[in-house]
Amino acid sequence: MQHARKKFRVGRTSSHNRCMLANMLKSLIHNERIETTLPKAKELRRHADKMVTLAKKNTLAARRLAVGRLMVRYNTLTGKEARQVKAGDLSAYNVDRRVIGKLFDVLATRFSSRNGGYTRILKLQNRVGDNAQKCIIEFLAD
């Protein structure tokens, strides 16, 4: 019997939470460091560590699970991406593809000898407007 199961609750609907976590995960993998609030970072740390562990398996099934969890869209472009491609800039063409590649190629090999604990949270000063605890979540430089 599990009493008081932890749930990610930040005052949004479940679909909004799911999309927000997927977007934050993509940003964290792409930039390897993001600034956010402490409750979001604590939840993101759980998911980021699971994604790196999944990437270390390096199987087709693991890639498909990662694509699903990150909500990667291969065949659609956002308005911004479409404008950049039309202007001739192909560097921003479907960033999600590069995120999956970086997860499985760069991060999985970097943490191949490590068994968990791939991220760290550094606390910052509180935000001025609403006094929310800010922090930086980043992958270790192992």
From Swiss-Prot:
InterPro entries, A to Z: Ribosomal_bL17, Ribosomal_bL17_CS, Ribosomal_bL17_sf
Pfam families reported in the protein's UniProt record: Ribosomal_L17
Subunit details: Part of the 50S ribosomal subunit. Contacts protein L32.
Keywords, alphabetical: Ribonucleoprotein, Ribosomal protein
Name of the gene: rplQ
Organism name: Chlamydia muridarum (strain MoPn / Nigg)
Biological-process GO terms, alphabetical: translation
Top-rank lineage group of the source organism: Bacteria
UniProt cross-references to Gene3D superfamilies, sorted A to Z: Ribosomal protein L17 (3.90.1030.10)
Disulfide linkage: none
A single Gene Ontology CC term: cytosolic large ribosomal subunit
Record protein name field: Large ribosomal subunit protein bL17
GO molecular function: structural constituent of ribosome
Record family assignment: Belongs to the bacterial ribosomal protein bL17 family.
